[in-house]
């Protein structure tokens, strides 16, 4: 389990567990800060002492290998998993370079040291300053509350009112600072994933230029370089999209925190001061407790907690409520007090003090006191305002009309759906389209009055105005689950199954929309809207959560993955019936308990080749972006990759054991491209390297593979000498263990999967076979020949 999300609503409760979560985030940032300092120190050693290059590289590699990114939430995306694994790949590369004993003369000041120092000083340093302010304000706030609550009720009303106003102003200031600090903590946790890895990539690219064998090794790992670059760009895009949503949620809660309280199992909860009586002549003391009450069971929990003493939880008490009585100031020299009698403690009465008169009234209402408010502590979440958009005949007409206009007029427009239209024009167009009298009069395909960006914004706005998202609140969680776990095949199968559980109108509308988005992605070379970019734009629209929380916003990246799967597998999902017996998604980190050990075909090979990397200089300046808007995603991965890369892809060579091994291992760019579902990514990757010698020879990788076509378009034609001596012709095999692919040339499968055309592979311990039209490598001890 990674770091828990910090909810903005918890800033107003300031519970002990909220403080524990804050400390966990702070500890992680401190660990990151120390690691970056050590990394910078190691980088400077490389510059200062070439004679100690070997020692410095080993230390550097060790640091990279041991560091692991923490994440917010209960799962990570494939992009984040690849980014996390990239540090270990870089570590292996450094060890490989150390074996070669090459003399390296490289200045890493501009490519590594400065970006890391900038990140540490500007980002981590800013968090430290925020922490100091937060700690100082915490001390001030609770000290003032203590002092305020000790005021005698006999003082003049004007004096008491002035003190009340001062305390309330101080509390509001504390809440403001707490909100900003929580937002900053979560932002830096997400930001470091890409701002930290990018300088590393630049540093490694510089190293390649100083090694004679760097060019050949880079070709071997070209697929990894491209995939990691896309992973980083996707992560950046998702971060930018999520950040605006988080800031919007924070502003909503800041304006009206009471209306955004999270649903809780407790009727009331919060801090109360409890009077602890002592034997004479010591009097009594007031101790702050965090109290929780369940009205149904009349169960009252209270835990002593002091913010200023390190925030350690004390031993809690639990009792059952008998009755609650309001205390008047003529019977006690404190304000906001009430008494509680416990049913299981006869004769024992506890006197408690709330922070304010309003909070006392709320507690009295929850506890069954005489004075009650019209609202309780944990009010239900206010539902979203629903527009008059519906999935009726008019709704389908509007969507089809917008789609037809977009495909006719602007399918090649750069930033399609990413560039937003003028709000007033969008609202006017929607009003005309949703009016029965004017809908047929609106000509979107030929009229110059409506820009394409206005039409696309109107389409998205209409979908967001539906009473319920297209993929429904009921199935929202079910769609998220396969995006968080399982193999690529099992994800597609699970989402295929869930789509057919949607109401018929929802499924029909989703089919129309996804078919259109597939067409848009097929023109990504012109409009720059890849499948990933479309996922970022339409994820929140098609799968908005029912409750707005930080935890829900952290799942935006998984919503994007679901939309990507829908686009990449549109024909299968909407044109074929689902398999009602598909297996449950398997967690990516889980392995079968009794599966035999797998013999890695890269054993002994991976340590002999470095990670292919690139010189990354991604500066997304607002002035260079022609499409600035709140809803825009950042510059797409295609945009940042469109410049010709100095690293070329692997080209077909003469047959031989080494060459065949390289191709089977995924060194060929064509192999990697052919394993990506759909035509979009294959053509996209070819466009990224327009000067690559494989562009013209990789046409077979552009079109989706048919069951009879070869999945390895770059493999040289096999000769008699190349054929394995014990070839198995036209044999079938059944999987006896589930398997998760570790490489693009391998197959993922579940127990019971049937493989066609199984043959012995050149890789020891591996077979080649076809599953669902895709050919790849299979661990020999995971299957049984039929």
Curated annotation (Swiss-Prot):
Biased composition (Polar residues): 676-688
Location of the protein in the cell: Cytoplasm; Cytoplasm, Perinuclear region; Cell membrane; Endosome membrane
Domain BAR: 7-262
Nucleotide-binding is among the record's keywords: no
Main subcellular location: cytoplasm
Post-translational modification: Phosphorylated. Phosphorylated in vitro by constitutive active PKN3.
Region of interest called Disordered, as start-end residue ranges on this chain: 576-608, 621-727
Basic residues: compositionally biased ranges: 599-608
Family annotation (PROSITE patterns): PH_DOMAIN, RHOGAP, SH3
Keyword vocabulary terms for this entry: Cell membrane, Cytoplasm, Endosome, GTPase activation, Membrane, Phosphoprotein, SH3 domain
Tissue specificity note: High levels of expression in heart and skeletal muscle.
Bias kind Low complexity: ranges: 634-651, 689-712
Positions of the SH3 domain: 728-786
Domain PH stretches: 265-372
A Gene Ontology molecular function term of the record: GTPase activator activity
Coiled coil: none
InterPro entries hit by this protein: AH/BAR_dom_sf (IPR027267), BAR_dom (IPR004148), GRAF2_SH3 (IPR035485), GRAF_fam (IPR047234), PH-like_dom_sf (IPR011993), PH_domain (IPR001849), PH_GRAF (IPR047225), Rho_GTPase_activation_prot (IPR008936)
GO cellular component: cytosol; endosome membrane; perinuclear region of cytoplasm; plasma membrane
Rho-GAP domain segment(s): 389-574
GO biological process per UniProt: cytoskeleton organization; negative regulation of apoptotic process; regulation of small GTPase mediated signal transduction; signal transduction
The protein's assembly and partners: Interacts with PKN3. Interacts with caspase-activated PAK2 proteolytic fragment PAK-2p34; the interaction does not affect GRAF2/ARHGAP10 GTPase activation activity towards RHOA and CDC42. Interacts via its SH3 domain with PTK2/FAK1. Interacts with PTK2B/PYK2; the interaction negatively regulates GRAF2/ARHGAP10 GTPase-activating activity. Interacts with MICAL1 and WDR44; complex formation might transit from GRAF2/ARHGAP10-MICAL1 to GRAF2/ARHGAP10-WDR44 complexes.
UniProt free text on domains: The BAR domain is important to associate RAB8A (or RAB8B) and RAB10 to endosomal membrane to promote tubule extension. The BAR domain is also important to recruit WDR44 to endosomal tubules.
Entry function: GTPase-activating protein that catalyzes the conversion of active GTP-bound Rho GTPases to their inactive GDP-bound form, thus suppressing various Rho GTPase-mediated cellular processes. Also converts Cdc42 to an inactive GDP-bound state. Essential for PTKB2 regulation of cytoskeletal organization via Rho family GTPases. Inhibits PAK2 proteolytic fragment PAK-2p34 kinase activity and changes its localization from the nucleus to the perinuclear region. Stabilizes PAK-2p34 thereby increasing stimulation of cell death.
Protein name: Rho GTPase-activating protein 10
Native organism: Homo sapiens (Human)
């Amino acid at each position: 389990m990674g770091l828990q999300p910090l909810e903005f609503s918890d800033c107003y409760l300031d519970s002990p567990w909220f403080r524990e979560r804050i400390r966990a985030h702070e500890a992680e940032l401190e660990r990151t800060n120390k690691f970056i300092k050590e990394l910078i120190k190691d980088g400077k050693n490389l510059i200062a002492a070439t004679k100690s290059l070997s020692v410095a590289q080993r230390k550097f590699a060790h640091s990279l290998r041991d560091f692991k990114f923490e994440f917010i939430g209960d799962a990570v995306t494939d992009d984040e998993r690849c980014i996390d694994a990239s540090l270990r790949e870089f570590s292996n590369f450094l060890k490989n370079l150390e074996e070669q004993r090459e003399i390296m003369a490289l200045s890493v000041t501009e490519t590594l040291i400065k970006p890391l120092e900038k990140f540490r000083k500007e980002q981590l340093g800013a968090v430290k300053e925020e922490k100091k302010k937060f700690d100082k304000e915490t001390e001030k706030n609770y000290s003032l509350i203590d002092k305020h609550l000790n005021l005698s009720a006999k003082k003049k009303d004007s004096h008491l009112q002035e003190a009340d106003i001062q305390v309330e102003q101080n509390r509001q200031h504390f809440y403001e600072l707490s909100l900003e600090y929580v937002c900053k903590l979560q932002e830096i946790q997400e930001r470091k994933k890409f701002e930290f890895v990018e300088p590393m990539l630049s540093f490694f690219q510089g190293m390649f230029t100083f090694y004679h064998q760097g060019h050949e090794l880079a070709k071997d790992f070209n697929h990894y370089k491209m995939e990691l670059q896309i992973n980083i760009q996707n992560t950046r895009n998702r971060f930018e999209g999520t950040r605006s949503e988080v800031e919007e949620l924070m502003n909503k809660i800041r304006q009206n925190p009471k209306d955004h309280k999270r649903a809780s199992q407790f009727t009331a909860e919060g801090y109360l001061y409890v009077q602890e009586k002592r034997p004479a002549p010591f009097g009594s003391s007031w101790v702050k407790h965090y109290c929780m009450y369940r009205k149904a069971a009349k169960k009252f929990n209270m835990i002593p907690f002091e913010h200023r003493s390190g925030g350690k939880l004390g031993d809690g008490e639990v009792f059952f409520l008998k009755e609650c009585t309001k205390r008047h100031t003529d019977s006690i020299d404190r304000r906001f007090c009430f008494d509680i009698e416990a049913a299981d403690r006869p004769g024992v009465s506890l006197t408690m003090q709330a922070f304010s008169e309003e909070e006392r009234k709320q507690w009295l209402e929850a506890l069954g006191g005489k004075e009650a408010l019209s609202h309780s502590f944990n009010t239900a979440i206010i539902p979203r305002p629903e527009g008059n958009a519906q999935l009726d005949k008019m709704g389908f007409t509007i969507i089809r009309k917008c789609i037809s206009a977009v495909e006719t007029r602007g399918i090649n427009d750069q930033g399609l759906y990413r560039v937003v239209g003028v709000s007033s024009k969008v609202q006017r167009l929607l009003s005309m389209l949703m009016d029965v009298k004017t809908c047929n009069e609106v000509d979107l395909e030929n009229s110059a009055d409506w820009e394409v960006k206005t039409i696309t914004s109107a389409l998205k706005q209409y979908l967001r105005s539906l009473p319920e998202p297209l993929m429904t609140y009921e199935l929202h969680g079910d769609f998220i689950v396969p995006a968080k776990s399982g193999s690529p095949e099992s994800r597609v199968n699970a989402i295929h199954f869930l789509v057919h559980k949607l109401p018929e109108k929802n499924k029909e509308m989703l089919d129309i929309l996804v078919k259109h988005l597939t067409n848009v992605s097929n023109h990504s070379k012109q409009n720059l809207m890849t499948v990933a970019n479309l996922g970022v734009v339409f994820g929140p629209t098609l799968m908005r959560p029912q409750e707005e929380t930080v935890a829900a916003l952290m799942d935006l990246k998984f919503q994007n993955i679901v939309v990507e799967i829908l686009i990449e597998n549109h024909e299968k999902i909407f044109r074929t019936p689902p398999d009602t017996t598909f297996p449950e998604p398997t967690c990516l980190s889980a392995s079968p308990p009794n599966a035999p050990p797998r013999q890695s075909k890269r054993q002994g090979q991976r340590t002999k080749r470095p990670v292919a990397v690139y010189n990354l200089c991604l500066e997304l300046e607002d002035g260079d972006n022609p499409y600035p808007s709140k809803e825009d995603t950042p510059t797409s991965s295609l945009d940042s990759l469109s410049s010709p890369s100095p690293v070329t892809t692997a080209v077909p060579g003469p047959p031989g054991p080494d060459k065949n091994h390289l191709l089977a291992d995924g060194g060929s760019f064509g192999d990697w491209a052919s394993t990506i579902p759909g035509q979009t990514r294959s053509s996209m990757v070819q466009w990224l390297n327009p000067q690559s010698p494989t562009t013209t020879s990789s046409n077979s990788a552009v079109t989706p593979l048919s069951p009879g076509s070869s999945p390895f378009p770059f493999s040289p034609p096999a000769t008699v000498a190349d054929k394995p001596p014990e070839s198995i012709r036209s044999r079938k095999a059944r999987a006896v263990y589930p398997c998760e692919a570790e490489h693009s040339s391998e197959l993922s499968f579940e127990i019971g999967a049937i493989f066609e055309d199984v043959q012995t592979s050149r890789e020891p311990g591996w077979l080649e076979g076809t599953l669902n039209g895709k050919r790849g490598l299979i661990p020999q001890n995971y299957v049984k020949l039929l």
